[in-house]
Regions:
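DNA-recognition alpha helix
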Residues: 66-76
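Major-groove recognition helix of helix-turn-helix-like DNA-binding domains
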Residues: 79-92
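Short, basic alpha-helical nucleic acid-contact segments in DNA-binding proteins
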Residues: 89-103, 108
Length: 414
């Protein structure tokens, strides 16, 4: 008598498993007590699809389409059904940005973080959609921790409230004693934000515009930052009061690097124990987030995505959240010792250093090339499985860094 094949319900999931998908599912389902199982499954499938696409070497202008992503989903269904599955995931109202922040923190830092690290917040525009990104510095790039996408015309109250809430949501996922050192650009130099961060005990560093008015200690007449005299190569530090009415006490660090068009005016909470040199070094890392935005738009092909409707921002947010794990894995692949062999094989270095390096390929590019070049793909696949096993044990991607970020020893005088 022939064995009858089990009859599958029409709506049953027909998943095409392999070692990579099993490891992805095992890693993500370990967090099923925090996040719905259906959401974790969809993130695993999208991660698998994007890694599959990485096996074809992508150029700097490689655009990505939702149709290409849907074709690579590990589902034993037709192309139309896979597209519908992807679209249902992007329209899932239960997938809010804040519920995945703890997962991203655990994947980036591990579950036993004991050091304070630099964290950057900045904003960019993707296809007309405003995008906020918070991430940790890693090998000249940023490990994504939190995203928030929005349309300016649809903001109900204030973008300032959205930014502050995103900062709080990210910071709340870290132990109090090792909360990251937040690095901000000039657009965030608001006294209201500084007061909030001080009251909440969150360390920060923010660059200010030269037109900002400050008051030196013991003086009643204020002056703009641009009126402070400084020569190229100099580094100065002052105790100041920020804002004419609030008079928020801050430390001002002015640095005029050689070859710079204008000085940096950096503000930190009053009494910060970091030296002026260390503060300047930390702010210099802010360029990492610009490189991170370029990665998402070009190497990952996000700028090629098209979303229709009056408010496409939530769908872009969910897709970026789903892309985060594949981005973390490719960064890790490009920052191992084995990646140095790939770099020597594919990279043509600059004759003159640019931004302090002669490299022309980022760790993300090296990670993607490891997957796509036949000469290195087998070893890269094994390393990928090994990374997923370590992530499942509570390790973080940041531990694969060849030159791990130095911990910030910080204390504030009360």
């Amino acid at each position: 008598m022939k064995n009858k094949k089990p009859h599958l319900h029409p709506n049953a999931e027909r998943i095409e498993y392999d070692d990579l998908l099993r490891k992805l599912m095992g890693l993500l389902l370990a967090y099923r007590g925090m996040i719905r199982v259906t959401i974790l499954k969809n993130i695993a499938w999208v991660t698998y699809a994007l890694i599959t696409l990485f096996h074809g070497a992508r150029g700097g202008n490689g655009w990505l389409s939702k149709a290409a992503l849907a074709r690579c989903l590990p589902l034993g269904t037709g192309p139309k059904e896979r597209e519908q599955r992807l679209y249902r995931f992007l329209d899932n109202m239960r997938l809010a940005p804040e519920i995945l922040i703890p997962l991203h923190v655990a994947l980036a830092c591990g579950t036993k973080l004991r050091e304070r690290l630099p964290m950057i917040l900045d904003q960019t525009t993707i296809r007309g959609i405003e995008t906020l990104l918070i991430g940790l510095v890693f090998e000249g790039r940023v490990l994504p921790i939190a995203f928030s996408c929005f349309m300016k015309k649809l903001i109900h109250k204030s973008q300032n409230i959205l930014e502050h809430c995103l900062i709080l949501a990210a910071m709340s996922c870290f132990p109090v004693e090792v909360r990251p050192f937040l690095i901000l650009d000039r657009g965030y130099a608001r006294v209201a934000l500084f007061i909030h961060l001080r009251k909440e005990g969150l360390p920060f560093l923010c660059r200010a515009k030269k037109s900002v008015m400050v008051y030196l200690s013991g003086q009643t007449k204020g002056q703009t930052l641009g009126r402070f005299k400084i020569k190229p190569g100099q580094l100065l530090r002052y105790s100041v009061l920020y804002h004419s009415q609030k008079k928020e006490p801050l430390d001002l660090i002015i640095y005029f690097g050689k070859g710079y068009q204008e000085p940096w005016y950096l503000l930190v909470p009053s009494g910060t124990s970091l030296t002026a040199e260390k503060i300047v070094e930390l702010y210099a890392k802010r360029m990492s987030i610009e490189q991170g935005f370029r990665d998402w738009k070009t190497h990952l092909g996000v700028r090629g995505l098209v979303f229709y409707g009056d408010n496409p921002a939530p769908r872009l947010t969910r897709l970026l959240l789903a892309f985060s794990l594949s981005y973390l894995l490719c960064l890790a692949l490009g920052s191992t010792e084995e990646a140095l062999v790939v770099r020597a094989f594919v990279e043509i270095e600059r004759r003159k250093p640019r931004h302090g390096t002669t490299r022309t390929l980022s760790v993300l590019s090296i990670g993607i090339l490891r997957l796509s070049l036949k000469k290195f793909s087998k070893q890269a696949y094994q390393d990928l499985l090994r990374m997923l096993r370590r992530l499942s044990r509570g390790k973080g991607v940041i531990q694969w860094c060849l030159s791990p970020p130095k911990p910030i020893r910080l204390s504030l005088k009360r």
